Regions:
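Conserved alpha/beta-domain cores
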Residues: 112, 120-125, 130-140, 144-148, ...
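N-terminal beta-alpha lobe that positions the nucleotide/phosphoryl donor
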Residues: 1-191, 200, 286-297, 302-304, ...
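Acidic, glycine-rich flexible loop/linker segments
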Residues: 66, 326, 338-343, 347, ...
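Beta-strand scaffold of nucleotide-dependent catalytic cores
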Residues: 138, 148-150, 159-160, 202-211, ...
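Conserved catalytic alpha/beta cores of large enzymes that bind or transform nucleotide phosphates
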Residues: 218-318, 323-324, 363-370, 388, ...
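Small/polar (Gly/Ser/Thr/Ala-rich) solvent-exposed segments
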Residues: 214, 450, 704
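Conserved metal-phosphate-binding beta-hairpin within the catalytic cores
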Residues: 142, 314-339
Length: 792
């Protein structure tokens, strides 16, 4: 390539590797590294070239502009937003007005001619790559510019000049000062890369780790129609996919969860080559919003590439990808170290102690809670209105906003997904953010007090008023040994990756009710008899089941995703999934449910559990649950998932439900399947040995056992003070159940509320020889440590 003396001014990507970060910056070095080392492993990266740091430094030196720049920066107060804006604009104009040295212009001309020799109409992406960018402990995400659909040599030259100027964007200047980088020690490289025609297909961002929890056994992929800049900027709410790495490696279906984004707009090529106007934004037709922007096969192919890249770099990675609309081929266009989760941190657990009126909801970023005064900011000119501790509410945050984002107690946006700039910066700053709310700027009013909670799963909520919350920190590397296993009760798959990072020995109770309620929301019979519903109900259901081929597939598919997420999060530890235990009033509350459920005076003691599964009126609904379990265990290979049957009243019912499961293809012992019974009715303990003939063990439900042993309605405030699992009658029944299971060499655990609430009860169960305690996640560490103290 062209030289100036001994140092090249331009280098091809295939000449570069990670040893060249100081010459071409992290972004360009990484592209070169992948082309050189991973192209034989199925990772496709479009070719290109990069100007070097030497070229940039010579450009500043030979023109003398560098002295003016550093003198101006030295006397600028970076924390004064208006002073910073004025200095930044002046510096960028100086750079744009300075001509390139002839040697650099000729070097770019030669490289451009080679890169476009096969297609004179080829379009290019011109990106910045700072020499301090994408170091693992500093996210320079988006602080320099990217220009897309740049065609022709003159347009490329203009774009490179603007990329050089972008080293002195306001946000980049501010970031360097706050991170302790010297302006003189940072240079810029411009990367010129052939464009992938994702304007005709889809593109997005993926991480080889879950960005919220740090769980490293999944790849998290976001995708939307058109050029990827919309996803990166947070201008669009993208589709989201989680892929389980061990299942992928086994060659099985590995997508554990899919969430459809609204994808209202896309960025495409514009007809003009006027600088900065080469792309345009257009609305998406409704039919494309209502389908996923990637097929399942493409999602898995991208995940494989992410795993290859992660294995090569030996660390979690943040990767931008694009699909070519002409060929259908998937390309990697950027890869950098994931910068927030890979730092490691003390475990923090935020808990909200009150519920308020929900004003807005969207995607939760992080797991924290923040509260403060709302400031609705419509454009960057209003930045000076934000005071420390305010809640910043806006349509979407451009990276230019970073200087004020760090002042906020929380951030709320109308648009954006979990991989947009607002999300990346919020994570880095440790500020809770709720993105993609749709209409937060209309619902939230300037000056009102709110609480922003990201501590309740994937969905973040904005509540009216300043609500009470607490935070617990714990740094537990190794837990003491106990004579029993400490497991967890988990219902919400959204929290599974987060909870899996706590000390645990699996899941003793995974409830299907949460999945049915929150991820489906429709009565199974209303879906099976979809054609019989009235037009209004059919429309409601169609809206809920977008992305699925049929009402039946919606129910089975969503159940499969929920169970698979729980199974994958704790794999290979056992995850005991209790099949549905809704009462008739709870089923009636589902969409379309009232038509199919009896009205019962006391649903707690009515049509529920095993009796429902074998009833003619529910058998085909139960078959949907069985189908989901089979997919998770047999197709995906998550055989750590076991099933639990609730509320088995009689031994005859036990026999009938085991026969029904076998009829549905879930036979005890087949493919290692274990079937556990909830021991929660006095008859279960009194006839424990007979019940155990049909099951592989017991899981004690102390809540129902207490209410039925003492004749209490646990939902009645009048008698609630008598409700206590530690009552001698209850303990006598539990002892019988534990002894019977021990005698037969079968598993016995407990998943009721008791051990989470009462450490003395947990200690008594340990003395009785129970195999496991399944606790609420927030009590796991404390109960584990206190039981270890007792054993000393």
């Amino acid at each position: 390539m062209s030289n100036n003396g001994s140092s090249p001014l331009v280098l091809w990507y295939n000449q570069l590797g990670m040893n060249d970060v100081d010459r071409v910056g992290g972004k360009n070095a990484s592209l070169g590294e992948m082309i050189t080392n991973l192209s034989g492993m199925g990772v496709s990266v479009p070719n290109g070239f990069a100007t070097t740091a030497d070229a940039f430094n010579q450009f500043l030196d030979q023109s003398g502009v560098n002295q003016r720049i550093y003198e101006l920066l030295d006397k600028t107060d970076i924390d004064d937003v208006s002073q910073l804006a004025k200095a930044g604009a002046q510096i960028r104009q100086w750079i744009i007005d300075t001509p390139f040295q002839p040697a650099l212009e000729n070097a770019i001309r030669d490289a451009y001619a080679q890169l476009s020799s096969d297609d004179e109409n080829a379009s290019f992406a011109v990106r910045s790559s700072a020499t301090a960018e994408d170091m693992p402990d500093a996210s320079f995400a988006g602080q320099q510019e990217t220009f897309l659909n740049v065609q022709g040599f003159d347009a490329v030259l203009v774009a490179v000049k603007h990329v050089f100027a972008s080293l002195f964007n306001d946000r980049a200047i501010s970031y360097r000062v706050h991170q302790g980088y010297d302006h003189r020690g940072v240079a810029l490289s411009a990367g010129v890369q052939r464009m992938v025609r994702s304007d005709l297909a889809s593109s997005g961002v993926m991480f080889s780790i879950d960005t919220e929890s740090g769980f490293d056994q999944v790849v998290f992929i976001t995708s939307a129609w058109g050029l990827g800049e919309m996803v990166v900027q947070g201008a669009v709410n993208p589709d989201e996919f989680y892929v389980h790495k061990p299942t992928l490696a086994a060659g099985r279906p590995a997508i554990v969860r899919r969430t459809m984004g609204s994808k209202k707009i896309r960025m495409v090529y514009a007809a003009t080559q006027e600088h900065g106007k080469q792309v345009k934004i257009e609305d998406m037709p409704q039919e494309q919003r209502d389908i996923f922007s990637l097929t399942n096969e493409e999602v898995q192919e991208l995940a494989k590439q992410a795993v290859q890249i992660e294995q090569h770099y030996g660390r979690p990675m943040d990767i931008e990808w694009a699909k070519d609309g002409h060929t259908g081929k998937l390309f990697i266009v950027q890869a950098r170290p994931e910068t927030v989760r890979s730092r490691g941190q003390v475990m923090e657990r935020y808990t909200l102690h009150a519920q308020g009126k929900i004003i807005a909801e969207g995607r939760a970023i992080g797991h924290r809670i923040g509260a403060g005064t709302v400031k609705v900011i419509h454009d960057i000119g209003e930045m000076n209105r934000i005071e420390p501790g305010d809640v910043l509410v806006t349509d979407m945050t451009d990276p230019d906003w970073e200087p004020i984002m760090k002042k906020a107690a929380a951030i709320v946006t109308n648009r954006g997904g979990r991989t947009c700039h607002a999300a990346i910066i919020a994570r880095e700053l440790g500020i809770p953010a709720v993105v993609g709310c749709g209409d937060a700027t209309e619902r939230m009013k300037d000056g009102e007090k709110v609480t922003v909670s990201c501590a309740e799963g994937d969905t973040g909520y904005v509540y009216a008023d300043m609500l009470d919350f607490s935070v617990k920190s714990s740094s537990v590397d190794t837990m003491p040994e106990l004579p029993l296993k400490v497991m967890m009760n988990v219902g919400n798959p959204d929290r599974a990756f987060d909870f899996a990072c706590l000390p645990n020995e699996g899941v003793g109770l995974a409830r299907l009710e949460f999945i049915i309620n929150r991820m489906i929301g429709v009565h199974p019979r209303a879906l099976l008899e979809f054609d019989d519903q009235d037009a209004a109900l059919q429309n409601d259901i169609r809206e809920m089941m977008k992305g699925f081929d049929s009402p039946r597939e919606f129910y089975v598919g969503r159940l499969t995703e929920g169970i698979a997420t729980l199974g994958a999060a704790f794999y290979p530890k056992r995850v005991i999934v209790r099949l549905s235990d809704f009462k008739s009033n709870e089923y009636a509350n589902l969409v379309g449910g009232e038509r199919y459920e009896p009205h019962e005076e006391n649903p707690m003691l009515g049509f529920r559990g095993a009796g429902r599964y074998v009833a003619e009126s529910f058998r085909d609904c139960f078959a949907l649950e069985c189908e989901a379990v089979k997919r998770v265990r047999n197709d995906m290979g998550l055989t750590n998932v076991e099933i639990m049957i609730p509320f088995v009243r009689t031994v005859d019912q036990a026999k009938a439900v085991i026969e029904e499961l076998a009829r549905q293809g879930l036979k005890r012992g087949e493919n290692g399947l274990k079937i556990i019974m909830m021991c929660e009715i006095p008859s279960n303990a009194l006839l424990a040995e007979q019940f155990l003939e049909y099951f592989d063990g017991f899981s004690i439900g102390s809540n129902d056992m207490t209410q039925l042993a003492l004749g209490l309605d646990r939902d009645s405030g009048v008698v609630s003070e008598l409700f206590d699992e530690r009552n001698d009658a209850v303990k006598a029944l539990l002892s019988m159940a534990i002894r019977a299971a021990k005698k037969q060499g079968k598993y016995v655990g407990i998943c009721g509320q008791g051990p989470s609430d009462h450490e003395d009860f947990a200690a008594w169960l340990m003395e009785e020889g129970i195999d496991s305690l399944s606790l609420n996640p927030d009590t796991v560490v404390q109960t584990w440590l206190s039981l270890a103290e007792l054993k000393k």
